Amino acid sequence: MDEDDWDDYDYGTYECGCCTCCGCTCYYDEWDEEDDL
């Protein structure tokens, strides 16, 4: 993976193709679970 790809990771647009408008849960599933508590 190129370092430039990490910029896309922050927006959740890399690899899983999550959209930034509806929120990405691909990289933040663990955080979302904590919010449900």
Curated annotation (Swiss-Prot):
It comes from the Viruses. This is Gene 40 protein. It comes from Mycobacterium phage L5.
